[in-house]
Amino acid sequence: MKKKLSLLLCLAMTLFVMTSSTKITTIFVIGDSTAAEKSNFKDNPERGWGMVLQGFFDDKILVDNHAVNGRSSKSFINEGRWQKVLDRLKPGDYVFIQFGHNDEKPKPDRHTDPGSTFDANLRRFVEETRQKGGIPVLFNSVVRRCWYAENLKNDDDEKLRKTVFDGEEKINSDTLIDTHGAYVVAPRCVAQELNVPFVDATKITHDIETSLGIKG
């Protein structure tokens, strides 16, 4: 009997070690088009950063990308997308949080204000992640490729990416201008306030774009 019990305990310990060593940690990505999955790979060179993130990890890490084109922190919550992430989140998982591009837009279903509703949504993502035992990481926005001499007031990202704006050539500057304002500051402030890891994606992508130049 003792021999069988010892064998059973050894088996249980072996299974425990095996399941512990093969535990998969998930990185959930929530955000907008700059992180989202893209289709039509053959004809569309555009890639969201969330698409390529898996390539930086081994098979013990799973990247689950929930970022969607056109979403703000507000619409991501209101459409039930955040709840879907929470339902799948387990202790030890990470949530990479990046919004701002569409929070700037004037449309009421998207718009939030930095220092107010935008910050409140970021806090919600952080606090609810922690309540589930997850680890939140805040990012600010990827820069737009705006090589204009002045900040063009337009809520159409596609127009802002073009070299011609309303029929007039606008690239007459070699300086990449900021189009996000306080929306890139808010994630940093919330990260400091709540002691959350912060990734300055604005600076990282600004430096990359600047090194490549206008034609890059």
What is the predicted role of each segment?
Residues 14-16, 44, 110:
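Hydrophobic alpha-helical membrane context
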Residues 80-216:
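Alpha-helical cap/lid subdomain in secreted, periplasmic
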